[in-house]
């Protein structure tokens, strides 16, 4: 186990394991979102969902982030879409949250993508820490939580590459 300092509290982070498959019903949504928004791959989007919520759409964080992709209400209000066409854009509905996350990350790429560094790492950092933190740092901020987030997403994306 690896201990990371998060918000002044020690958080125990289990090493990435290959026993967390992508739920089969979500694979088409990850693929469609990757095709539509053209930034993160389907495996990277699935990895984000794994890191954010372990694919649990009912998760609500202490900060109030909701659903499989952990949207804050204000971010959802701006970027949330009705991905499944049922007439309701709901951050708890993975079929809405997945394309909404890809849409938001396309926006983040426009905001932070010109900073020095890997564009995907910058977008993941902005998703995790907020675009203002990335802009202020001039790149990926030196936050243990954010660096750990990027590493975990990359690890899971590699694990999911053949699956998604």
Regions found by a protein language model. Give the residues of each.
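Sec-dependent N-terminal signal peptides
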Residues: 1-2
